[in-house]
């Protein structure tokens, strides 16, 4: 919905029925089914502290993630390998090929490699309008967070994929 609306210029019409809600912006209608039940307590999944907090250009990170994700087929993970001062994104699919690209990042400490579902990582980066994001990580087996660096409150929880050596 946020991507459909131009702030301060578009008017949003909202319609609610017993089992759905419809948002209309200009010629575009977005509908969603209403679900009964308790919303999951995602707050309990959010880690309290992180080993690494890296500020990265959203556009640069997203561009590289999209490009490398093309090689992550058949549930192949997108690998993020952190070493001193850099992040290498890679993916490979047998019989298709592999891709690798490196970004400069303010990483310090022991090298770390973590895997994410490429679609989920790209979706998280596409969901923010911030120029920079802060990637918050603990270790390869714990959830990570993508947070907008502009203080807008954007928060995206992403679960890792266990990597085979």
Each model region followed by its residue ranges:
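Glycine-rich, pocket-lining loop/helix-strand segments that form or immediately flank
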Residues: 38
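DNA polymerase processivity clamps
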Residues: 1-35, 50-165
